[in-house]
Amino acid sequence: MSEIEEEEEEGSASAITGSRSFDLPDELLQVLPSDPFEQLDVARKITSIALSTRVSALESESSDLRELLAEKEKEFEELQSHVESLEASLSDAFHKLSLADGEKENLIRENASLSNTVKRLQRDVSKLEGFRKTLMMSLQDDDQNAGTTQIIAKPTPNDDDTPFQPSRHSSIQSQQASEAIEPAATDNENDAPKPSLSASLPLVSQTTTPRLTPPGSPPILSASGTPKTTSRPISPRRHSVSFATTRGMFDDTRSSISISEPGSQTARTRVDGKEFFRQVRSRLSYEQFGAFLGNVKDLNAHKQTREETLRKAEEIFGGDNRDLYVIFEGLITRNAH
């Protein structure tokens, strides 16, 4: 018995010595078995417990990390969808911007076109306003100078065309003198005296125009269309043409031309200038009438010849107003002679 006790004491002493060498606490050494194999078995169990605990902790931590990763992935997907929506909005905004730029360019071109149209219309309105003022002044002058000057000469008793002689029983119907259309002169004849029909007509004075109405004269057609009948017909046909002009044209006067033509008619036809211009205004457009006025003004200002004036007048009147051109041509041609 004593030997066994000694061995146990030696074993415990060696265990204590080993614990001291491994720095194990005394409490643990007291509960450890003395057999080394049993100590290894205890150590294995302790290691298994430690590993199991560590693995459980790591698995728990891994699960938490997976949950956090899932949340981050979800946030990433949300952010990615938001980025895609923003990119779509940006693309739509660029498309709208390009459309707005194109519309802006179209509006700029349209604005420029409308501005040009407005300027052109303003110029047309200014021209029409000036034309209207000219017509109003002409009509006012026509109203103030009521009636046109009439020159009617007494024919000779025989049938041949003889010069007219003024009658003693002449009556003055107009208080303003009438001047004839001055013929157009060339550029080198500007200093020459300008002939006028008033020099060849038997006018009483330059301020009054007598109307010579001899007894026994045939019917006379005046501007108003009222015939004045007499008792004795004659064979020659005499035309008294009165040419009324507007302000700024033919120097604001009315010109009368007496034309003697052989024939068998027994009446005198009188073409009134005022009525002629009314026909011209009513039958021509504003542009044509303005061109006609400018043509006559150029003739009076000696800027063009009589032939050029007639050519332009023929283009203005055209084929539909051939009668007006014939009257105008007769007035200018006879005045030149």
From Swiss-Prot:
Residues modified as N-acetylserine: S2
GO cellular component assignments: cytosol; endoplasmic reticulum; ER body
GO BP terms: ER body organization
Name the record gives this protein: Uncharacterized protein At4g15545
Coiled-coil ranges from the UniProt annotation: 50-130
Positions of region (Disordered): 1-20, 139-242
Record has rRNA processing as a keyword: no
Residue positions where Phosphoserine is found in the record: S217, S235
Positions of post-translational Phosphothreonine modification: T213, T226
Keyword Phosphoprotein among record annotations: yes
Domain of life where this protein originates: Eukaryota
Sorted UniProt keywords: Acetylation, Coiled coil, Phosphoprotein
Biased composition range(s): Polar residues: 197-211, 223-233
Low complexity bias spans: 170-182
Acidic residues composition-biased segments: 1-11
